[in-house]
Amino acid sequence: MSHGDTIRVDASVRAKCGTGSARALRAAGLIPAVVYGKNRDAVNISLSHADFLKKCRTLPIFSQLIKLCIDGKEEFALTKEIQKHPVSGAVSHVDFQFVDRGAEIKVEVPLVFLNEQKCAGVKLGGALNILHRSLLIRCAPDAIPQSLEVDLLDLAIGHSIHVSDLALPETMQVAMKEENPVIASVSATAAVEEAKEDGAPEESAQGQGAAEAQETNK
C-alpha cells in the first residue's frame, strides 16, 4: 500500500445496543463497533469478524485511512481502538473516528528499522535501544504513509537518532509533545567497557616506554 490508499471495511448500522445485543452479534460472527467524530452523532455499526481480523493481520489497520461502507454509504475514518478477548484473541469491539478528507489529522505511523544486525555500534558489541516504534504525525488524510523507515547502519556506540534526523516529506509534521525525542541509540555494554579497561594499561605502558626511550636518547 502507498500514500492515498484506503482499506475498505463493509459495515451495517445496528439498531440495538447493549451487552445482550453485542453478545448476539459476536455469536453470529460479527463485531459490534462505533464510529464517532467532532460535531457528528456516533453511529453504532457491525462488521464481519473474519474479514476485519484478516485485515488486522495483513494491513496497517491503525495507520491507513479506512473507507467505511455503511449500508452502501461511504464514510472515511481512522481505526482508534480494537478490543480483543484476553484468551481467544477474538476482536470484541472496534472504535472508528470519522475523518474530514479536507482537514489535516493526527495519526500514529509505525517505524520500520533497517540494518539492525548491520548497525555499526552493534557489530562492535554495543546494545541497540529502540525508544519509539511509531511516530505521531500531522498530515492530510490522503498523505498518510504506511510506515517510516529508520536506517541504523551508521549508528555508532554512544550515538543516537533523533526525530529531526528523519527525512520527512514537507507535507508531514511531527505532532509529538516531546521536542525532538530520541528514536534509537546504541549504548556500550559491560563487555565493551571491560575491553576498553583491558586495553588501557597496555596503552599506558607503551606510552611510558616511549617516554623513557626519549629520555635515554637525550
Curated annotation (Swiss-Prot):
Pfam families: Ribosomal_L25p (PF01386), Ribosomal_TL5_C (PF14693). Coiled coil: none annotated. GO terms for cellular component: cytosolic large ribosomal subunit. Residues 187-218 are annotated as: Disordered. Keywords: Ribonucleoprotein, Ribosomal protein, RNA-binding, rRNA-binding. One of its GO terms (biological process) is translation. Belongs to the bacterial ribosomal protein bL25 family. CTC subfamily. Part of the 50S ribosomal subunit; part of the 5S rRNA/L5/L18/L25 subcomplex. Contacts the 5S rRNA. Binds to the 5S rRNA independently of L5 and L18. This is one of the proteins that binds to the 5S RNA in the ribosome where it forms part of the central protuberance. This is Large ribosomal subunit protein bL25. It comes from Anaplasma marginale (strain St. Maries).
